[in-house]
Amino acid sequence: MQSGRQKYIRNFSIVAHIDHGKSTLADRLIEATGTLTEREMDTQVLDNMDLEKERGITIKSQAVRLIYKRNTGEEYTLNLIDTPGHVDFNYEVSRSLAACEGAILVVDATQGIQAQTLANCYLALDNDLEIVPVINKIDLPSARPEEVKQEIEDVIGIEAEDAPLVSAKTGLNIKDALEAIVNKVPAPDGDEKAPLKALIFDSYYDSYKGVVCHIRVKEGAIKEGTEIKLMNTGKVYEVVEVGVFVPNYMPVDELKAGDVGYVTASIKNVRDARVGDTITEAKRSANEALSGYRPAVPMVFSGIYPVDGAKYEELKEALEKLQVNDAALSFEPETSIALGFGFRCGFLGLLHMDIIQERLEREFNLDIITTAPSVIYKITKTDGTLIELTNPTNMPSPSEIKLMEEPIVKSSIITPSDYVGAVMDLAQNRRGIFKDMQYLDTTRVSLNYEIPLNEIIYDFFDALKSRTRGYASFDYELIGYKDADLVKLDILLNADVVDALSMIVPRERAYAKGRNMAQKLKEIIPRQMFEIPIQAAVGAKIIARETIKAMRKDVLAKCYGGDISRKRKLLEKQKEGKKRMRQVGSVEVPQEAFMAVLKTEE
């Protein structure tokens, strides 16, 4: 049932492909409703991290309250929830969408529908949201709004005839977008007298307030002093403050069903207020939690080590600080013979990994070495025990393995039809299994493949972009595990295994990969005073070898003529010395070597 107050509330989010102008449109809406003064307007208000502004991407979800006055004099409260657009943060997007009744689908008038437009749009449809298409960038000379409207109708199957045509950059027709939100997005409902149910769609740590939870109240009301309980963790807290974002904090007396705002309750750690959890009253609690909660599961693992071993404690502190704000980051200590003490970290995906590494270097001034990323393999041993393997170094010997499974993703690639051959070739090289293809229009094709996650984890995206001149877009989701014939490839330097360079590869590729890595390392590792053999091995079998020749002094320079036996004696003596050096010498592996191993060519 709707109250009169709820009739004037609209909760919506904006979904789009990367760079279609989502955050810019949000800025224009904020400006058009006069939420911030000209002076306070900063480009991309909702992206607060420097890293977000620089890369032009949204990493954390944000929310802001806009007051829109129609010409008829009615006042509407619009709650805009800005979501990350990247596939790594899919779960955050789905929780932000669950807090809304409608979604604005921003489509670039020059590019049309892209892979993530589709992925995010289907995510919104899964949450039963009303979708309002908005066509952006119509100020560009290459804009083709009519074709894009047709494309939205054909591909997604939603009405786009009267979609507002806007330019978020110049602020053209922003009023039309606001009108479309009011007219098309349904008002929230929910009983204000029922027991409290509120969805946490984001939470982060504020050094003064503790953990701040962004919430959407579904039923009931919440105010200062209420004793609340988090349904999935079972913990009880007392509310210190409730309020709304304008985009800065503005405390209010209470939030009722249909409202979006924030709540603080002296929670110390983000892990206690997980995204997707349900807040209810401790004394009068709801019968069941809101559906859709799942803990964040890392998909990609990588070792992070300080370049200077003495900085281990600093790295640990830095990771702990990042974890306070990022419940999806996990880490545990590990040691490597080659790199010393460090941490095995788990991430949601490659972008997440990249961002964490960059934040460690920027915000904490740490020099770090990262090892090749790996995924979680499931191994059934011969004695029937099941293990999950995140670090290739810990792989059991082949005689103990009965079955080994690797994660598989369903990927959709949208590419201009001229490049279909190149894209198919790339997907097949990466052990992709072709599922289906459909033409979106005369020039663009959507290809669906099942590809092992291990194959797209490093440079698949770069390779895809370079083969399609940057035109292809890519989106993936994990669908399950499949058994595979995999082996552990070890690299030996001077007959010692360098554990940080070990990797898991398909058996049929082991030889080529080993050969390739040995050649790469030969170019990168500096010459020493003694000869260094570089070997690639699977188990005890050496499959490839390269040798870095020793630097040597010309010991015969002082012999002019004379007897050959004199020269031989000097050469033998040098040879003995080199042999001794080789036994005691150790080889330093430069950071470039780790990076090069990742970038082995196709």
UniProtKB/Swiss-Prot annotation:
It is an enzyme of class 3 (hydrolase). It catalyses: GTP + H2O = GDP + phosphate + H(+). Signal peptide: none annotated. It is found in: Cell membrane. Keywords: Cell membrane, GTP-binding, Hydrolase, Membrane, Nucleotide-binding, Protein biosynthesis. The keyword ATP-binding does not apply. Its EC number is 3.6.5.n1. It is a peripheral membrane protein. One of its GO terms (molecular function) is GTP binding. Residues 7-189 form the tr-type G domain. GO terms for biological process: positive regulation of translation. The keyword GTP-binding applies. Disulfide bonds: none annotated. NCBIfam families: lepA, small_GTP. HAMAP family: LepA. Required for accurate and efficient protein synthesis under certain stress conditions. May act as a fidelity factor of the translation reaction, by catalyzing a one-codon backward translocation of tRNAs on improperly translocated ribosomes. Back-translocation proceeds from a post-translocation (POST) complex to a pre-translocation (PRE) complex, thus giving elongation factor G a second chance to translocate the tRNAs correctly. Binds to ribosomes in a GTP-dependent manner. This is Elongation factor 4. It comes from Clostridium botulinum (strain Kyoto / Type A2). The lineage of its organism: Bacteria, Bacillati, Bacillota, Clostridia, Eubacteriales.
